[in-house]
Swiss-Prot record:
Membrane topology: Multi-pass membrane protein
Any one GO molecular function term: magnesium ion binding
HAMAP family, per the entry: DGGGP_synth
Keywords: Cell membrane, Lipid biosynthesis, Lipid metabolism, Magnesium, Membrane, Phospholipid biosynthesis, Phospholipid metabolism, Transferase, Transmembrane, Transmembrane helix
CDD domains linked to this entry: PT_UbiA_DGGGPS
Keyword Oxidoreductase: no
Protein name per its UniProtKB record: Digeranylgeranylglyceryl phosphate synthase
Catalysed conversion reaction: sn-3-O-(geranylgeranyl)glycerol 1-phosphate + (2E,6E,10E)-geranylgeranyl diphosphate = 2,3-bis-O-(geranylgeranyl)-sn-glycerol 1-phosphate + diphosphate
Compartments where found: Cell membrane
GO biological process: glycerophospholipid biosynthetic process
Protein purpose: Prenyltransferase that catalyzes the transfer of the geranylgeranyl moiety of geranylgeranyl diphosphate (GGPP) to the C2 hydroxyl of (S)-3-O-geranylgeranylglyceryl phosphate (GGGP). This reaction is the second ether-bond-formation step in the biosynthesis of archaeal membrane lipids.
Length: 275
């Protein structure tokens, strides 16, 4: 058994990002007050996210044999039946760990598992529906951290909404990048439906709204670290807005959006400190 192969399979860097997102939601909701169980929502989110990545690779194996033959499943480093069982274990452990957090967090964990499974099994091919599910489950990582602290609503809703729309725009950009492969595989993305230029316009409108509204959290309780950080990060989005509406630009934009996503988690987290 290769540990490296399993870390690749769960996309460990993405899982860490999900955990950081949950941590952000938690510290915003509690104003950095920790209970002995503060780590549980981080574990729940990490395990369920990992399970989602694994089951996604299970259903994507035929496509990955062509597009990503080096991945653990198509390369044969991990057997498909083993990966399927591994995803079940990850989902089950994540769900069990959510029980001490209460009925509502348990329910959210269960719903997220169902969404991730159905996305991998069939909803991904619906394109726009799949984009919304990816955006929703990404945003739920932040929301879950706040929810697990005992709050249904609070300032943690702000980054949750922000993450949803940012991820949605990133999914549209990814659809532009993957348009040829999606056409061949019958994935009905927005880019396949409308074409790359129209999809670029929609993605840029969303990013433009995010830039315009990005200072608002400062006036809703986040500190000056947030304001300075988000305005600096907005430069990346402005650069994306001036890129040409092409497939090549989508590849460049996606790389910049990864940097922006990490930076946003940091500035929202530090921006919740009471200074």
């Amino acid at each position: 058994m290769s540990v490296k192969a399993y870390l690749e399979l769960i996309r460990v860097h993405n899982v860490v990002g999900s955990a950081v997102s949950a941590f952000m939601g938690y510290v915003i909701a509690t104003t950095w007050k920790f209970t002995p169980l503060f780590f549980l929502p981080l574990l729940v989110v990490s395990l369920i996210a990992a399970g989602g990545y694994v089951i996604n690779d299970v259903y994507d194996i035929e496509v990955d044999k062509i597009n990503k033959p080096e991945r653990p499943l198509p390369s044969g480093r991990i057997a498909v039946n083993i990966a399927r069982r591994f995803s079940i274990v990850l989902f089950a452990v994540g769900l069990i760990i959510s029980i001490p957090l209460g009925l509502i967090p348990f329910g959210f964990a269960l719903i997220t598992i169902v969404l991730l499974y159905e996305y991998a099994r069939s909803l991904k091919k619906l394109g726009l529906v799949g984009n919304f599910i990816v955006a929703l489950t990404s945003a739920l990582s932040a929301y879950y951290g706040g929810l697990a602290s005992g709050s249904l609503l609070g300032n943690f809703i702000i980054p949750t909404i922000y993450i949803f729309f940012f991820t949605l725009s990133r999914e549209f950009v990814k659809g532009i990048e993957d348009i040829e492969g999606d056409k061949r595989n019958g994935v009905n993305t927005l880019a396949v439906k409308l074409g790359e230029k129209s999809t670029w316009i929609i993605a840029k409108i969303i990013l433009g709204i995010l830039i315009f509204t990005s200072p608002l959290p400062y006036f809703l309780g986040f500190n000056v670290i947030y304001l300075i950080g988000i305005l600096a990060l907005d430069v990346l989005l402005v650069y994306i807005l001036i890129l040409h509406n092409t497939i090549e630009s989508a590849t460049k934009a996606r790389s910049l959006m990864k940097i922006y996503a990490i930076g946003t988690l940091i500035v929202f987290t530090l921006g919740s400190l009471r200074i």
